[in-house]
């Protein structure tokens, strides 16, 4: 056991010596011992500290937007944390950032764009209507408010609505019976 540890340490030492000889040909690659310290310094570094890494150059530049005189793209030498199994914390989006529907079909999308363009054109001509109703027909709005909704706020159809009412009535009955049995058990023990 100890001999294998010594062989391993000797092997690492000879590997480091060879790296020092070849250092003028290639940039040094971090060894396995330094791997943990690199990962922890990348993950736990504060944004205001001086040892934080600057973002590297984008590895895949588009040749159409690059100048003729610009230097050719260099290979990306940064550390890919996703490939090492380290998860980065994402920046949470503000809750009011998404004001539009997320899923629309092609016709709806083109209709939305067409309305935005016409509204922008009217605003540029100062002909925009100041007070717009949020909905066109009051009765349709009231009906939509009263309709039961399912997962994601979508309207339920009649078949699913009946199942939804049966499930909720069944749950209420089971909750009532469980509550009565619990009260009977507690009154019987005291």
Swiss-Prot record:
Gene3D superfamilies in the record: 6.10.250.2430
DNA-binding region coordinates: 133-158
GO cellular component annotations of the record: nucleus
Database matches in InterPro entries: NFYA
Subcellular compartments: Nucleus
Gene Ontology molecular function, alphabetical: DNA binding; DNA-binding transcription factor activity
Extent of motif Subunit association domain (SAD): 103-126
Pfam families assigned to the protein according to its UniProt record, in alphabetical order: CBFB_NFYA
Domain of life of the source: Eukaryota
SMART domains referenced in this protein's UniProt entry, alphabetically: CBF
Subunit structure: Heterotrimeric transcription factor composed of three components, NF-YA, NF-YB and NF-YC. NF-YB and NF-YC must interact and dimerize for NF-YA association and DNA binding.
Protein family (similarity comment): Belongs to the NFYA/HAP2 subunit family.
Protein name stated in the entry: Nuclear transcription factor Y subunit A-7
Species lineage: Eukaryota, Viridiplantae, Streptophyta, Embryophyta, Tracheophyta
